[in-house]
């Protein structure tokens, strides 16, 4: 079931800008929220947009950015897949780097979006981080750091996921 569902999700995300937007919005809805509440949020967002009670200011920025940039993000993620492959460290690093540009999306959630696009990376939650003996802050990425440091931290995260 896992492989079947992952394949379906990847096809949805990579086929159209709307499909990619869909998984980005889904990811935004999972931030600090149990999965059981995601459907409720998505229904509300579809009906009320960023005026939904579920949408905070930062989540609204992410939703608006993803909507406005869906075509560019979709073209970029497909270009990354074509250039680097989905099963390489370079491909996963580039995918995560692309998605951290979305407001409200940190490195871990960017990994989740990239994973749903078929790249070999994941979304390591607090429980996984603790099991690995790392501090939760180890995976926090300051988006204002220099590009070389950002890319290095993303690459380390991708390797950790493998």
For each feature predicted by the language model, list its residue ranges.
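Structure-specific DNA junction-binding interface
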Residues: 1-64
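C-terminal accessory module of base-excision DNA glycosylases/AP lyases that mediates lesion recognition
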Residues: 1-12, 18, 70-78, 89-162
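Short, amphipathic alpha-helical segments that act as regulatory/interfacial helices
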Residues: 24-33, 74-81, 158
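Alpha-helical ds-nucleic-acid-binding substructure associated with the helix-hairpin-helix region
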Residues: 40-103
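Short helix-capping/linker segments at secondary-structure and domain boundaries
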Residues: 31-41, 80-86, 119, 136
């Amino acid at each position: 079931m896992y492989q079947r569902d992952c394949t379906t999700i990847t096809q949805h995300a990579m086929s159209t800008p709307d499909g990619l937007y869909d998984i980005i919005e889904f990811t935004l809805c999972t931030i600090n929220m149990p999965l059981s509440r995601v459907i409720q949020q998505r229904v509300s967002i579809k009906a009320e947009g960023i005026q939904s009670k579920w949408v905070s200011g930062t989540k609204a920025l992410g939703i608006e950015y993803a909507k406005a940039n869906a075509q560019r993000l979709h073209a970029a993620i497909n270009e990354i897949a074509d250039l680097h492959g989905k099963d390489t460290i370079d491909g996963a690093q580039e995918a995560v780097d692309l998605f951290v540009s979305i407001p409200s999306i940190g490195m871990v959630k960017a990994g989740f979006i990239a994973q749903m696009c078929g790249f070999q990376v994941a979304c390591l939650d607090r429980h996984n981080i603790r099991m690995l003996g790392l501090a939760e802050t180890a995976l926090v990425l300051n988006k204002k750091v220099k590009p070389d440091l950002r890319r290095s931290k993303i690459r380390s995260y991708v390797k950790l996921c493998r």
